[in-house]
Amino acid sequence: DPFLLGEIATVHALSDIYASLCRPLFSLAIINLPETELSIQTNQLTHILAGALIAHSQAGVRVVGGHTSEGGNLSVGFAVTGSSTKLPSIIKVDKDEDLRIILTKPLGTGVIMAANWQLRAEAVSVDDAIANMRHSNLQAADIFMQHNIIAATDVTGFGLARHVQNLAMRVGIEGCIIDLTSLPLLSGVTSLFDAGITSSLHEQNQLAATVHDYDRHPSNLSAVLFDPQTSGGLLGVFAAKDAKNAINALIETGHRA
């Protein structure tokens, strides 16, 4: 669906700015159209831009130009420029401080899209994944900033484990404990992993992350650690005293944190 593709690509691209705790200002579109009849290309481009412009407008961001190319598969991306009113600071965390990591969206878009490609995904799972990918991280970023966020990123193609690992390195801690049963998941994800379905990037993500004891879990739930996400949620580090209020604020605003 070119309209949804344009919308989700926008939300995905803007998320990098929100994860930096900044505000997006404008973007440039990069669109590749398959070689086909001009009327089909025109229709695809029109629907892509319609979805993208609506999502940009909702975020208060302008599309100021872009580039199109032809050949291969239909693809859409945006180069986004943002700004911050705060000067960058060096992150310093006491190694003995009690910290929590908050994830603002459920996981599983990678495995659901892989299953859908194989015609093995339930409609409810696909619908849940699409709704999740369309959901902007703007409000979650605002909540993070209101509750003394220490550091943040967003969960995208590298999967949760690698992004948690990178975040831990940024704040100077040796590692994190992830309770698999506490992770928010999209509909049907556990069943898909139990059926042996994984995304094409799954194995690569597993090799790239340093994770201990994940294979001791009694089910295949640990596979979600390496599932690549499209338009995934924000991941934030908080002091334990601030994390509870941040979680409550996210849940009150409809986030499946």
Predicted regions and their residues:
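Short, hydrophobic/aliphatic alpha-helical segments
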Residues: 96, 136-149, 219
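Glycine-rich phosphate/pyrophosphate-binding loop regions near the starts of catalytic domains
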Residues: 1-105, 109-126
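Short, well-ordered alpha-helical scaffold segments within catalytic/effector domains
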Residues: 10-11, 49, 134-138, 219
